[in-house]
């Protein structure tokens, strides 16, 4: 593989006859090869879409998995390092992963607004462009990412995306307020799609001792039935 920004490759061909005589005027070819920087991007649809969230904000609990694909014209094996950072891209903020890494599950994330940064580097030292989530250059994806705190031991899962005004969630929340008091439970609005990674589904549920999941069967083009997928992630 190319180990510098520009390298020279030498090719030489000699003819040999049946007596073992070697051509003294070998043909030579010198090729200057310029290294290509690697590329990295998030796996298709691995970040939530605004259309599925019915909001421009993605809310998660303190576990979030990011999945990506990397590519190098000189061969993917030349990618030696993947780096990620949270909220700050200072020189010492980056955390290194092996070059063949394709995902990371972050745990115990800071509560509030967060941004995830990602880049990679090849054996010649060339770095990819930095990609991030959220990113305004991808307007179909969520434009804000907020990590919610774990409150109480009860989780209400709102799996009713057609209830845009949240009347059902408000009703169940008022019942929980009456039974257990304010701030004694958490809620999770799924929207039209579960998180891309089943690891995140399991992590969200395992934060709590009791899960109250309400849903409405709809089988329409505008909303999917996500509880089946959630059940599969726990098997």
Predicted regions and their residues:
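Low-complexity, disordered linker/stalk regions enriched in Pro/Thr/Ser/Gly
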Residues: 1-149
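Residue-level marker of alpha-helix boundaries and capping positions
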Residues: 2, 162-163
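Beta-sheet entry/capping signal
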Residues: 81, 153-154, 210
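Residues that line or immediately flank small-molecule/substrate-binding pockets and catalytic motifs
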Residues: 86, 158, 215
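Short beta-strand segments enriched in small/hydrophobic residues
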Residues: 151-162
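Helical hinge/lid and interdomain linker segments adjacent to catalytic or ligand-binding clefts
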Residues: 164-235
């Amino acid at each position: 593989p190319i180990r510098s920004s520009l390298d020279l490759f030498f090719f030489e061909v000699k003819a040999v006859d049946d007596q073992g005589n070697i051509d003294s005027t070998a043909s030579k070819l010198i090729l200057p090869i310029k290294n290509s920087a690697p590329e990295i991007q998030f796996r298709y649809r691995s970040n939530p879409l605004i259309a599925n969230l019915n909001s421009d904000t993605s809310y998660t609990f303190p576990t979030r998995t990011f999945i990506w694909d990397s590519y190098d014209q000189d061969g993917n094996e030349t990618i030696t390092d993947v780096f990620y950072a949270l909220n700050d891209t200072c020189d010492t903020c980056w955390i290194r992963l092996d070059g063949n890494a394709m995902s990371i599950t972050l745990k115990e994330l800071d509560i509030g607004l967060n941004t995830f940064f990602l880049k990679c580097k090849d054996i010649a030292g060339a770095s990819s462009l930095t990609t991030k989530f959220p990113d305004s250059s991808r307007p179909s994806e969520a434009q804000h990412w907020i990590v919610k705190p774990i409150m109480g031991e009860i989780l209400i899962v709102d799996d009713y995306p057609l209830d845009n005004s949240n009347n059902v969630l408000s009703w169940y929340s008022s019942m929980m307020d009456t039974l257990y008091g304010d701030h004694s439970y958490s809620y999770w609005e799924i929207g039209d799609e579960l998180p891309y990674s089943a690891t995140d589904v399991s992590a969200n549920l395992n934060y709590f001792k009791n899960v109250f999941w309400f849903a409405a069967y709809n089988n329409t083009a505008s909303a999917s039935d996500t509880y089946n997928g959630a059940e599969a992630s726990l098997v």
